[in-house]
Amino acid sequence: QLQFTDNIKAAVKDAEVIFLCVGTPSRPDGMVDMSYLETAGKEVCDSLAEQSVDYMITIVVKSTVPAGTNRRLYDFLKQQTRAYVQVVSNPEFLREGSAVKDCMEPDRIVVGGESPEAFRIMRRLYDPLIKREEIFMTMNWESAELTKYAANAMLASRISFMNEMTILCEGYGADIEDVRKGIGSDGRIGPAFLRAGCGFGGSCFPKDVAALEHISRAVGHENLFVNTIQTINQNQKKRFVERIEEKLGRPLAGAKIAVWGLAFKADTDDIRESPALDIIRHLLDKGVIVKATDPKAMENMKPVFKDEVEWSADPVSCAAGADAVALLTDWPQYNTLPFRKIAATMNSPILFDGRNCLHRDIMREAGFQYYPMGRPAVENALRLKHRV
């Protein structure tokens, strides 16, 4: 029952529901690039113009788009085709790495539109996935469009808030993990997206937060909250590099830094808006000799930095001869590395954990000075350079 084609006319022929699932990346100014959706909409419209059908066709926009987009698409289709067409906004809430599970077990299905008949079609379409009636939510186009942006901005704000708290934790000797558990156990807050680190990235959060800023300006509003989310995220990456310089106790020019992790998160090769992009650039700008590794994302990162960075096949060889390690992605295999062996091969066994994913006691016993984010550091490590 599943067919593949690159022919749009063949794809939409006799279709009752047509999904538009094209990308809406950021333009250089931060606004949404709508060209892919506009092209898809026009091609669907041209294909429908050649058909004569006596039933309603529902166009479902899965793409993340600014408020007002679906309404404009509906007006365009109504003018350009004789077919009876309705447009529905149905934003996706899939997490990279667990998209199939999220699709099959949704915690909410948001459907925006103005046609009760289209709502009924969408309800019937999603019926096998609806375990509780309340997860199927209908609203107007603009509400559905803003729901997607608001959700991602809210999640990004939680990360940025915790990242800002790491500064206070470091200043007062608190532990951000204890703070996280303390506030996450509050039922009004919950534990999700409260892990501090060296910044957030990926294909959604940075793009959607930037777009929400532009959407706000379009109605004459300077969204200070959204601006702050972005500012904190950028500052956290700069602060990570500044902390390396501070703890090394000298200018970074000529220092050798090993970077472990290039993907924006573990279990993916996706480097879009990865904190590693900015952190490596900051290091290079300071004259650092950067050697980098990642179990999946290295081939995607190589075209970005080319020969500005030395590429290593594994963390052990990457750290050899380094003045410090910067851990930027929480790959689980980094927890089981031979840290004593690694420490013995480094110029100075210092590790900056941008994901708080390693254990202090293990790092201390391996002879590392260890600097996590917002957690007590290990500065009295055992000197085991002579032991392998």
Predicted regions and their residues:
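Structural/interface elements that position substrates and couple domains in central-metabolism enzymes
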Residues: Q1-V388
